[in-house]
Amino acid sequence: MAKTFNQMVAAAMAEVPVISPAKAHRRMQEDPRTLVIDPRDAADIPATGIIPEAMNISYGALTYKADNELPPEWREPELEDRSRPIITACESGELGALSGKLLKDMGFSNVSILEGGTQAWKDAGYPTK
């Protein structure tokens, strides 16, 4: 049966841990290896800005940049360690949820979704750039 975008987001959020901005901030402070990925297209970043420590890898590019079986020139070196803590965050959370699920399906074992995305991060008083 075909799924809608909202159904896929709900399924992703049911399968991948969702964390609050406060918990995400704390995790980033406690473990500097934590990688924050913003899966929006670069043109969409100015809407809310980006978490300063975040790496912008669009959802489309993430599908191959996280695949360690592809040639090295296609991959993102920051994604070699499948146990590295990763937080996915888009503007409001939906694309972050799909990206978190994608990474989990690709074998990443320590992935979380930022609840409410970058907008919730900003609303909680944390900086963006």
Label the predicted regions.
Residues M1-T34, P39-P85, S92-K129:
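Rhodanese-like catalytic fold shared by cysteine-dependent sulfurtransferases
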